[in-house]
Amino acid sequence: YTGSWQKFIAPTTGIYTLEAWGAQGGHRGNNNGGKGGYSTGQIFLNRGQILYVYVGGDGNNHKGYNGGGLLPGANIYGGGASDIRSGGYTLNNRILVAGGGGSVGSSSNAGGYGGGLTGGSGNGSFGTLGTGGTQTQAGTGNISGSFGQGGNGVYANSGFGGAGGGGWYGGGGSGVDGGGDDDR
């Protein structure tokens, strides 16, 4: 992780295996955020062809760089996606994506895991649970994810709802119930 993209220039013409691991969501208390997902694929590259590598930031120290949603009040984030892009720097140039894990909401349940194909949903028994993003739609929740971005978590009535991780489509952010009970 560097906080910026890195450039890879193919040294020879041939088939390359690409791998990416999404970042872990932010932790609080005794529980960790969801683990990041894993993706792999192969691509044919000509000598000198350029790929842009984005390594997602974890949800605590690196603020969910590359799409992790924010959990206000706790200042933690969902994990950022890790991806590889070809032909440019935009989200539409991504050719391989591994989703970041969701942040913890409460201190008693882990966040949802990041996906390769589909991310995991939040864990808990109160409020609105965030669902994982997929290749075709963002995760839903109290605040839904969007293209490339996890939904924000919620801090209300002294309760926390976890933030979604980044991905092709980001995971949804969780909410809290009316009494402020934590959701994950």
Predicted regions and their residues:
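C-terminal subregion of chymotrypsin/trypsin-like serine protease catalytic domains
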Residues: G172-R184
